[in-house]
């Protein structure tokens, strides 16, 4: 067992993040972006480091590592430290490999004006890079999983679950420049069975297979049939599937945000240090509490007895209480109830507050 696995992993993100040059030697030969005037080029290595920096900063600023740990406990359960290590390595390095597909020679030629390894230019996928990155990711981590299973460091069940995540994470990478659609659509594309004839996944796999064989004389890990994965999801509890859905959306959001910040830094020269955290809270509260709507609510709270359920149900457009009329009575009552519940749970993590259309959410 590796030294990293001598203890229980708790998402030590910086130690888990891989340098790009440990995965490919082409990071400094290939470019990720051009400046608007075309005079400056950002290498793939530079872009990856920026993305990793922002990914880490967002996780740290939002305390997302606690979510990682909780998900790992709830979804993965009792697994070996080696399996835990591989899972965490796979999760953290979604950002590391998300643009590695830009070593596609046609992307370099058509997008970066870089005539790099033209003899390996793909015929079927043009300059696309996201789906190529997804294949790179799959091959890299499926190989790690297979090796660990072959060495007896992880068992078959752990191998199956880790492979599930390898496919899910590669799917996230494939969609990082677009919306999240059907995972089944992605699997169909990998196997050449996409009903909309979008078999770019299979085409990217075939190109990558040729590229790796020509350069390194190494085979690409064979892709599995996704029926096994779908069967596992069907028989898995709804609760675990909800965890998995939330995990997928979280990693997708983190990747897109980090990529955006990193690209913006290169294009503008501005290094972002604000991740939506509120630092001037006293000024904001003072400004907010002095607007007319909030003054009206505070006056209502001070001078009017709160409605019980029966009274609340009888409020209509002609109801007048104090200087508040109709639907604004309902909005005021809902605001005060929400505020009281929030104050009573001020030390809790609150992720979602639901309110119907027309309830005055903009004032909250």
Annotated model-derived regions:
Residues 65-79, 145-161:
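Intrinsically disordered, low-complexity domain-flanking/linker segments in eukaryotic proteins
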Residues 44-48, 323-347:
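N-terminal pre-P-loop "Q-motif" helix
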Residues 46-58, 127-143:
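An active-site-proximal "capping" alpha-helix that borders the catalytic cofactor pocket
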Residues 51, 59, 94-98, 133, ...:
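Conserved structural-core and active-site-/substrate-pathway-adjacent residues in large, well-folded domains
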Residues 346-363:
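Walker A/P-loop
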Residues 1-29, 53, 148-319:
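N-terminal accessory nucleic-acid engagement/regulatory domains that precede
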Residues 1-123, 305:
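Acidic/His-rich, divalent-metal-binding segments that scaffold phosphate/diphosphate chemistry
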Residues 123-135, 164-175:
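Elongated alpha-helical scaffolds
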């Amino acid at each position: 067992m590796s030294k990293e696995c001598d203890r229980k992993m708790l998402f030590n993100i910086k130690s888990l993040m891989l340098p790009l040059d440990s995965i490919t030697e082409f990071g400094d030969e290939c470019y990720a972006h051009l400046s608007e005037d075309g005079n400056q080029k950002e290498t793939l290595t530079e872009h990856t480091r920026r993305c990793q920096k922002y990914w880490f900063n967002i996780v740290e600023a939002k305390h997302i590592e606690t979510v990682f740990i909780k998900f790992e406990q709830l979804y993965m359960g009792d697994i070996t430290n080696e399996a835990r290590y591989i899972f965490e390595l796979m999760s953290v390095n979604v950002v590391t490999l998300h643009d590695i597909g830009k070593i596609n020679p046609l992307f370099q030629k058509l997008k970066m004006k870089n005539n790099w390894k033209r003899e390996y230019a793909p015929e079927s996928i043009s300059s696309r890079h996201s789906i190529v990155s997804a294949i790179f990711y799959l091959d890299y981590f499926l190989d790690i999983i297979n090796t660990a299973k072959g060495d007896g460091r992880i068992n078959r069940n752990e191998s199956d679950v880790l492979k599930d995540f390898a496919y899910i994470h590669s799917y996230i990478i494939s969609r990082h420049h677009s919306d999240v659609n059907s995972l089944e659509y992605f699997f169909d594309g990998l196997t050449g069975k996409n009903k909309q004839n979008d078999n770019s996944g299979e085409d990217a796999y075939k190109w990558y297979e040729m590229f790796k064989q020509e350069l390194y004389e190494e085979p690409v890990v064979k892709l599995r049939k996704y029926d096994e994965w779908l069967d596992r999801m069907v028989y898995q509890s709804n609760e675990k599937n909800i965890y998995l859905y939330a995990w997928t959306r979280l990693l997708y959001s983190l990747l897109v945000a980090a990529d955006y910040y990193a690209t913006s830094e290169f294009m503008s020269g501005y290094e972002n240090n604000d991740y939506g955290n509120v630092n001037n809270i006293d000024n904001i509260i003072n400004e907010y509490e002095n607007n007319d709507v909030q003054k009206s609510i505070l006056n209502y709270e001070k001078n009017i007895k709160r409605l019980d359920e029966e009274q609340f149900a009888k409020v209509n457009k002609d109801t007048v209480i104090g200087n508040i009329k109709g639907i604004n009575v309902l909005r005021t009552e809902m605001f005060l109830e929400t505020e009281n519940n929030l104050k009573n749970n001020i030390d809790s993590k609150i992720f979602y507050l639901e309110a119907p259309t027309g309830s005055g959410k903009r004032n909250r």
